[in-house]
Amino acid sequence: MSGYLVDLHVHSAESSYCGHVPAHEIVSAYREAGFDGIAITDHYGGYFFDKIKELPWPEQVDRFMRGYEEAKAAAEGTGFKVYFGIEYRDRITVDDFLVFGLDRQFLLDNPDLPDNPLKEAAERIHAYGGFIIQAHPARIRYAMALGQKLFMGFRTVDMVEHMKTGEKLPEIDWAERDALIGKPSQLTSLRMCYLREPDSLDGVEVYNGNPTWAMDGYAAEKYADEHPEYVRIAASDFHSYPCGMGGTYFDHLPENDAALVRALQEKRVVDFHIGHDVHVAPVKGK
C-alpha cells in the first residue's frame, strides 16, 4: 500500500486508566508493525482528572501528558512520528471526540474544558486551531435485565452477527441503561457516541478497531455521507495487544502536530488499514 500509515487513536498506560501498555513499548510495537506514526490520544475528562484533583492543575496536566511525552522520547531519532491528541469527553454525555492541534499551554489555560458541553468546548478548540473528529460513532452495546442486575457481557462478534440479521431491537441511550433493571428481560441496544453536534465537528472515525465494542458501520458511513465536509479516518483505539488494528494512510508523513492538522483539513487521506471486522457494514474508503 502506498502512503504513510498512522494510527490516530492510541492510549498509553501512563495516562489512560484503561491503557495497559507503556508508551515506550507502544512505539516499539508500532514500528515493528510497519506504521510510520501514532497519535497518543489518552482519555481527557473528569474520569481522569477527578482521581488526581488534589494536585495543582499544572501537575494534573503533567500527569496527563506523561504518556505522550514518554512515547515522543522513545521515538526520538528513529523517524517514527508521535503526535499529541486527546480523546475528549464532557461531563454531560458519554460521547468521545479525538482532538488534535492542542498543546500543554491550551490545557493549562482551560482547566474547565470537560465541564462544558461539546459546542462550547469546540469553540475554544477551534479558536486555538484544533481539529475535532467524532470517535467511534454509533457504538453499540447490548443489554438485558436479569432481575435486579443488568447483563452487558455479550461478545462483540455475537452482537455484530446479530446486527447483520437486521432484527430491530428496542433502543435507549447509554445513560438511561439503569432504567432496564427490574423490568421484564428483553434484549436492548444501548446507543452511545452518535452525532449530537455535527456542526462542531471536522471529521468522523468511520472504522474503529477496538474489539471490545460493536459499531454500526451503516450509521457511521451514513454520518460521513451526510457531511461531505468531514475527513474520514480509520484507527485502532489501541488499549492493549494486538496493536495496529486500524490506521489511516496519508499521502505524506506530517512532520509535527500542526502539519497533522493541515493534512486532516486538506483531507490528505489516501486509504485505510482495516485490522479486523467489528462493523456491520464494510468501510467504503476515504
Where on the chain are the PLM-derived regions?
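Conserved beta-strand termini and adjacent loop/short-helix elements that scaffold enzyme active sites
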Residues: 85-87, 135, 235
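Surface-exposed amphipathic alpha-helices with a cationic face
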Residues: 31, 69-76, 119-133, 220-228
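Charged catalytic cores and adjacent phosphate/nucleic-acid-binding surfaces used
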Residues: 1-16, 20-29, 92-108, 123, ...
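Conserved beta-strand positions in the central sheet of alpha/beta enzyme cores
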Residues: 39-40, 133-134, 205
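Active-site substrate-binding loop(s) of clan PA
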Residues: 111-120
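An N-terminally biased module of ancient metal coordination in phosphate/nucleic-acid-related enzymes
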Residues: 1-91, 115, 240-242
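Extracellular glycoside hydrolase catalytic/binding regions
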Residues: 137-140
